[in-house]
């Protein structure tokens, strides 16, 4: 199959295999070794060994070759708890009340086009309201295979296909389907590299753009890259998020959220749609 359209422009990436086409030759071996290790670590673990929590599984993409596995993952998780929106999850944490049961709140980072084409139909079919954190400067963008930002900021390893992002029309369509559009900054930057004033502008300008274009409140923020004190400053940027009018800040820390936990320190579990049940069982049973 050709990697370019009739006009010579690289066609959009459609599969995870295309997204990772330039992985080194030993990448499959590393993935196999990791899978074997996780199978061993998952022995005896159960997602429902504990209760009274909210977990925040998050993804970046659902490409064509990931759709079936993504649907299978959601159906698997539905056997252990209830899916709730980030608005409801944060309201529960804000209340300080008891969390009675097990809840999953799904989100996606970066705003790739596959959120619309791959994830949305599967989520909507199941009545799941997911959050999508978008980079507002990337709305409507298409990055070439050799684009430095595509590789540096979004982990793109495509060979002959481009990386396509959501448009504002896409975001409005998703919002009409019950999805929630959150901010992943104006640009995909490490807030830790910025002064407080510049960081505040990233939060406030992206929030304003989303509210203007989508016509709904943008109440949730997720710093790019996600690791506190490395990629952003938890105290400083949490304070900036509160002052800007956000209700939550999502991190890349793994683990469950429980009664009394701070919605400006949301822990989330990164997943890939193609992973098997043993991988979900391991990561979603961690404290």
Q: Model regions: which residues?
A:
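A short secondary-structure junction signal
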Residues: 143-144, 192-194
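C-terminal active-site subregion of NodB/CE4 polysaccharide deacetylases
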Residues: 2-107, 113-114, 193-287
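Short beta-strand and adjacent tight-turn residues that come in two discontinuous sequence segments
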Residues: 133, 184, 249-251
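Active-site beta->alpha N-cap acidic-glycine motif
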Residues: 51-69, 82, 86-180, 187, ...
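Short, flexible active-site loops
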Residues: 184-192
